Amino acid sequence: MNSSNLENLNYKSSIRDEVVPSRKKLTLPPWLEVAKPRLIPLLLATTLGGMALTEEWPLSSPKLICTLGGGALAAAAAGALNCLWEMELDKRMTRTSKRALPAGKLSSETVFLAAVSCTLAASMLLVSGVNYLAAGLTLLGLFSYVILYTVILKPRTTKNIVFGGVAGAIPPLVGASAATGHVGLSGWWLFGLVMLWTPAHFWALAILLKDDYASVGIPMLPSVKGSVFTAKAISRYGWATVLMSIMGVFALPEGGLLYGIMLLPFNGRLLQLINELKKSPDDLSRAKSLFRWSILYMFGICLLLLISRTQLSVEFEQQSMQIFLSIVSLLSN
């Protein structure tokens, strides 16, 4: 290997270390590591978003705690089963070889029993404290992540995250069903938004890790089609995400005006980063920036949904309508 190639690999490695939380920088106990706790907060945020889209918001504290607690336990179980299934694959990748299972810090039996225990606990909590539909949807999300994405799609197709993203899009349905006992159109809107957001979000990370995926034969889009093709795909899904996010103005029972106004800078920044990556698809720092912002973007959307259901938002809409009617009255005279 010549010096230029070595420098390029070192550069990519340093960028990856900045994007993917390093075990050297943040060491988790083995039992917590396999639960993939970094993924759970965003899943719970979209669950809250699904709740905020219903007329029943805010929920009672017991139901809220049971919904979020059950969701966290199910997500932990899904993470553990994912680690268990991919243990041999992780051993072959430098980035993942020191994880708890491939490094032998935990036994397969222990992780499997923990996953089953978390699944049972989540089911009991949701059935007893929420409702059967919320419990069933949560288990469907777990099944989708472990079986549909991890086992079936991930090792077989570049569209793995497009269809496998359904697992990450189910929490809004759980939130809506927890609040009302059914899933309305607003809940399906947030489901669709997460589905469209997921490929653009994940492919930005996959650009940084494309060599790792290629080395073990995982057909992630950047590894198979290259960064240029992937950046164009990210752009398409990014624009679709922006257009879908605007529909939230109509999905909210109230507060849509404030949501729409506060949404503008989020969408503007997302499109800016997507455009920058499209211009320089091999620039890992741009992929890193887009990946990071995409996470903040979805957290931001959920926060906007919650803010839009406050009394402040209702008063803002009322005052805005009064100002609008006053302007119309002045112009008509």
From Swiss-Prot:
User: What range does the record give for the signal peptide?
Assistant: none
Gene Ontology annotations of biological process type: heme O biosynthetic process
Its membrane topology is listed as:
Multi-pass membrane protein
The record's keywords, sorted A to Z, are:
Cell inner membrane, Cell membrane, Heme biosynthesis, Membrane, Transferase, Transmembrane, Transmembrane helix
CDD domains associated with the record: PT_UbiA_Cox10
Entry-linked Gene3D superfamilies: UbiA prenyltransferase (1.10.357.140)
**Known EC number:** 2.5.1.141
Concerning HAMAP family, the annotation shows: CyoE_CtaB
Per the similarity annotation, which family is this?
Belongs to the UbiA prenyltransferase family. Protoheme IX farnesyltransferase subfamily.
Any remaining note in the record?
Answer: Carbon 2 of the heme B porphyrin ring is defined according to the Fischer nomenclature.
What's this protein's function? Converts heme B (protoheme IX) to heme O by substitution of the vinyl group on carbon 2 of heme B porphyrin ring with a hydroxyethyl farnesyl side group.
Any idea what this protein is called? Protoheme IX farnesyltransferase
The organism encoding this protein is Prochlorococcus marinus (strain AS9601)
What gene does the UniProt entry assign to this protein?
ctaB
